[in-house]
């Protein structure tokens, strides 16, 4: 059978939709997991021996880094859609740097908490905080690995207005991680 141009476009379209659907399904499962954990946090908080503590101020800096990274990721994708390879590369490198800064500030915040006596095994409130922020950081690490892969591809000139799928997948997941952190941060500020 001879494959025609419309058939090739249809195969490419089907492949794109399959990857995007799988990504969305995985993000829905992550939302369910974090919803369950935050629900558990609220239920457990109502019981005795809940230790109330202030979040380290460095979490605000973490939040700024990850929000800025969302902007640089948006810029990178917009640049790729316009075939601006320089803007794409710079946007992805900035996003990668901000992701590393977010990771560093998360570890710094955990260090502050330990100095204040908030441990994973010390109290349920500390355990929930460590699990929520730690799981987010694990997902962010996965996003950073894929971001590094996409950044390498961008440096090699692989992405342009006609080839955006890996970049789009990376962008969708990165914005999801940003939104998830914002939810967790606000939740931890409001629900003590």
Model regions and ranges:
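...captures the hydrophobic TM-helix bundle architecture rather than a specific catalytic motif
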Residues: 1-192
